[in-house]
Amino acid sequence: MEAPLQTEMVELVPNGKHSEGLLPVITPMAGNQRVEDPARSCMEGKSFLQKSPSKEPHFTDFEGKTSFGMSVFNLSNAIMGSGILGLAYAMANTGIILFLFLLTAVALLSSYSIHLLLKSSGVVGIRAYEQLGYRAFGTPGKLAAALAITLQNIGAMSSYLYIIKSELPLVIQTFLNLEEKTSDWYMNGNYLVILVSVTIILPLALMRQLGYLGYSSGFSLSCMVFFLIAVIYKKFHVPCPLPPNFNNTTGNFSHVEIVKEKVQLQVEPEASAFCTPSYFTLNSQTAYTIPIMAFAFVCHPEVLPIYTELKDPSKKKMQHISNLSIAVMYIMYFLAALFGYLTFYNGVESELLHTYSKVDPFDVLILCVRVAVLTAVTLTVPIVLFPVRRAIQQMLFPNQEFSWLRHVLIAVGLLTCINLLVIFAPNILGIFGVIGATSAPFLIFIFPAIFYFRIMPTEKEPARSTPKILALCFAMLGFLLMTMSLSFIIIDWASGTSRHGGNH
């Protein structure tokens, strides 16, 4: 019996300006293809059905207005995470050459993964991650994608707020030139994280379109560029190895120089051994850093929303945006890891900023870097919140039109829950380590590959074609990384130690 024919609109866009062809293409509908009612598509502006003048305006019916540059800022900011603080630690446990190889491999794989997403979305006319899941596997696929996005991004937002909770009191303490932490409310991280969430994060999260956050994204990236410049600068001003009593100095730079001179006379033999970079390292923690590297370029839930809001969108243009964003973050990641590692070598801690406190807790430059990092992670939270809100819309309100009340309530509810987790959960990093180890491989490797395999018509690419075989291998790689990550975390818990080097 012949399969029914389905008319699909190729590359539909909300502003109708796409130039890659809008003619209907008649393709046989395979048994695994599904069409969801347009009314059930994403209510946060992430699908791209054409505007119909005969119907009541739908809030997906807006023109993409985000420029190429703003889109690069938004996607780069989505890629950048708190993991950049742990990459020097990862390099210390892999060596420079192995680190560079892993970082390059992950960057290329992330670009390939985005290519699969864009190609799948172009075939079926969908620009929502969850809707691709529906098209490939029906409601279970849609819910699985929405759940993975929700877990991954809640974990990411929690790690950002955790940084605010731990770092902001130290910044205030340094500004006030206090030797010890006081019991005042403005030195309490719990109060501070709530204050930042209400006054900065929530207003940005209430914006209706991601494009407007391009300005805050640009500022956030500027903060991380400043962090990188400071790391490079400090490489040439921090002695190696660090004197044993360096963490007792409190801003007396003449004393620091005297100690530096004395120690250099005493530890010349040890310095040559300790202060020599390793190019290839394999130890008990090397494998533990691989998941950190693998998840350094997580941005896939944000790719399709940014694609939707792009001015004059096309697959080629969005792929260029993705490649440029990945390339920028690749360079920043490598330089931050390299100069952070070459500053402290094997003495680097899992969070790079903590290591600098050994040199001088009241260093003005490091204080400014802390402020820059806090600013960057604060401005990243609203961008990460957008796909979570969209996923919740997909799961709970699939047939509802846009409502400002629901838009606000979901944002407030999410921030409230995340603040409660950050404040009351003592082992939050371990909890979200598991979440990241399970959801990230699905979002980066497994879902894009299997969605592509199911959605791409067999008439265009047979099941045994090279692209589909590569996609299946890509999915298998994701399962392998997920198994490795979970195994390392379980071993970590069983041994009662913590060796986390960072988190996206």
Swiss-Prot record:
It catalyses: L-glutamine(out) + Na(+)(out) + H(+)(in) = L-glutamine(in) + Na(+)(in) + H(+)(out); L-asparagine(out) + Na(+)(out) + H(+)(in) = L-asparagine(in) + Na(+)(in) + H(+)(out); L-histidine(out) + Na(+)(out) + H(+)(in) = L-histidine(in) + Na(+)(in) + H(+)(out). GO terms for biological process: amino acid transmembrane transport; amino acid transport; asparagine transport; cellular response to potassium ion starvation; female pregnancy; glutamine secretion; glutamine transport; histidine transport. One of its GO terms (cellular component) is apical plasma membrane. Glycans are attached at residues 74, 247-248, 252, 323. It is a multi-pass membrane protein. Its main location: membrane. The keyword Cytoplasm does not apply. Disulfide bonds join 240-275. It holds the Pfam family Aa_trans. Changing residue 387 to Q: In DEE102; uncertain significance. It is found in: Cell membrane; Basolateral cell membrane. The chain crosses the membrane at residues 83-103, 106-126, 144-164, 187-207, 213-233, 324-344, 366-386, 408-428, 431-451, 471-491. GO terms for molecular function: amino acid transmembrane transporter activity; L-alanine transmembrane transporter activity; L-asparagine transmembrane transporter activity; L-asparagine, sodium:proton antiporter activity; L-glutamine transmembrane transporter activity; L-glutamine, sodium:proton antiporter activity; L-histidine transmembrane transporter activity; L-histidine, sodium:proton antiporter activity. It comes from the Eukaryota. The record marks 77 as: Modulates L-glutamine-induced conductances and Na(+) binding. Keywords: Amino-acid transport, Antiport, Cell membrane, Disease variant, Disulfide bond, Epilepsy, Glycoprotein, Intellectual disability, Ion transport, Membrane, Sodium, Sodium transport, Symport, Transmembrane, Transmembrane helix, Transport. InterPro entries: AA_transpt_TM (IPR013057). It is linked to Developmental and epileptic encephalopathy 102: A form of epileptic encephalopathy, a heterogeneous group of early-onset epilepsies characterized by refractory seizures, neurodevelopmental impairment, and poor prognosis. Development is normal prior to seizure onset, after which cognitive and motor delays become apparent. DEE102 is an autosomal recessive form characterized by onset of variable types of seizures in infancy. Belongs to the amino acid/polyamine transporter 2 family. Symporter that cotransports specific neutral amino acids and sodium ions, coupled to an H(+) antiporter activity. Mainly participates in the glutamate-GABA-glutamine cycle in brain where it transports L-glutamine from astrocytes in the intercellular space for the replenishment of both neurotransmitters glutamate and gamma-aminobutyric acid (GABA) in neurons and also functions as the major influx transporter in ganglion cells mediating the uptake of glutamine. The transport activity is specific for L-glutamine, L-histidine and L-asparagine. This is Sodium-coupled neutral amino acid transporter 3. It comes from Homo sapiens.
